[in-house]
Amino acid sequence: MAASKNSRNSRRFKSALTSAAASVAFCALACFATMACAVWYFYRAGATLYYGDAEAHLNIARRIIDSRTPGWSQIGTTWLPLPHLLMLPFVRHERLWMTGLAGAIPAAIAMSLAAIFLFAAVRRAFGSVTAATAATAVFLLNPNTLYLGAIPMTEAYFFAALFALLYFTVRFDETRGWGALAGAAIAVCAASLTRYEGWFLIPFTAVFLLVRGKGVVRRIAGVLVFCSVASLGPAIWLAHNRFYFGDFLYFFRGPWSAAAIQGKTDYPGRDNWQMAVHYYFEAGKLAIGLPALGLGAGGAVAALYRRAFWPVLLLMLPPLFYVWSIHSSSTPVFVPTLWPNSFYNTRYAMAFLPLVAFGIGAIASFGRIPAVLAVLLAFTPVMLHPEQHSITWQESDVNSRARRQWVGEAADWLKPRMGPNETFLTSFSDLTGIYRELGVPLRNTLTGDNDVEFVMATTNPPVFLHTDWAIVLSGDDLQTLLDRARRNAPKYELVHRVTVKGEPALEIYKREDDVPELPEHDDTLP
């Protein structure tokens, strides 16, 4: 009888394992297919590189391998490096780089993995495929998720790391195993190399592992191992900033940091907790919808009832980080429904979505009818107004019109006039999109990221400045340099100007060297 009972238990275990694997495999197939369709849709709509940040992420990855000074130094200082490193296999292909697909494809893979880890985590937390399906649908089918997962932005990579951390910590809570702990450490390390809110997750996760571990010695050893791996991300970034820029915190207080960009200009929420919460919640309503936010809040209570304390705490951390950033870290969030009635950083409200999705998964764990009703209610705004673009798509469109006009007109003007392998003095900024559209290798551009060569060219132009063209914004430092250089040599003549209302003009200069004529040959000379 005992053998028969053990046999039945073994069969049940194998059956459950097979069922779990099959459900995850089906989820993976659906997620990858969904994101492939999203990439194709936004590419056909021409929206892949609407965000200026998307253009910049793509070109940072490209310049690591295609620059006058290629290598690790081209990663820069403000944005964390992992997304750019993951784009490297794709940006090597010129056509993928020129179209932006080199950044869209890895982002779509990351967003698919995020949804798969969410499915697995919710299934394990509530023991319900229905709950996992509902949570995954609410997350992946959000129009903003589809857009941000189909363009070269960092949100997809962070969501993948966050949900991997969720899965491995939920698994650790059940098994107390070293494999789950190692998975959690790798996941949070990846998060910390993707976005700064990943750093915020490390101490909370360490405390969770310490509290939920088994045995005093095993707990301490586990936390030490976790912290050793998890802290590699911040340690690498601090060392990178110290080595290349002379300051461990250059990313935080350098000229390209959020604090430097915002300066002392006031904005709603700065040093005001109530206003910070108000603006962030308003952005959340636009990005996720009020019904979904309400369901997420109710679902969080349901999750606590189901004793899923840690997942709720973990998924609350990113929204709390952003409210803190609005209040204390020079990070404004503007929405069209509140003063100054514009778009800026609205995508940060997507940090609400993991908690909302998990909460709806908790509601769905009570049965199929609650699951269907919760999912339908969450998507009510989309169903009522299917013609409206997502808030992130709107933001990227509105804020990129000047840049797209600059890039398009400049590229159209240059295409029939530039020769093969001609070189450009320029800045690594929005203007880099011109060279991407034209297929000009970034090694044919000279920018401030080329260190010694750029310094030599700008401090002694007659000797070291040899580019065929210069493309600058009116009034910037390079335009001033060209005016100064005209007094001696080389001379750059303004040949075209692109003007956009309310923006500085883009100016294209062509080098006009005075080449002295050779004397005629004199046969009488010896």
Where are the regions that the model predicts?
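Multi-pass, polyprenyl lipid-linked donor-dependent membrane glycosyltransferases
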Residues: 52, 83, 102-110, 134-164, ...
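Transmembrane-helix motifs of polytopic, lipid-linked glycan transferases
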Residues: 105-126, 160, 164, 168, ...
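Hydrophobic, aromatic-rich transmembrane alpha-helices
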Residues: 210, 282-322, 356-359, 375
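Signature aromatic-anchored transmembrane alpha helix within multi-pass, membrane-resident enzymes
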Residues: 25-30, 202, 207, 227-231, ...
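Membrane-lumen/periplasm interface segments of specific transmembrane helices
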Residues: 37-40, 220-298, 320-322
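Perimembrane helix-loop-helix junctions
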Residues: 4, 171-177, 201-234
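Short periplasmic/luminal acceptor-recognition loop of GT-C membrane glycosyltransferases, typified by
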Residues: 414-447, 469-473
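Membrane-embedded, lumen/periplasm-facing catalytic core of multi-pass transferases
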Residues: 378-431, 521-526
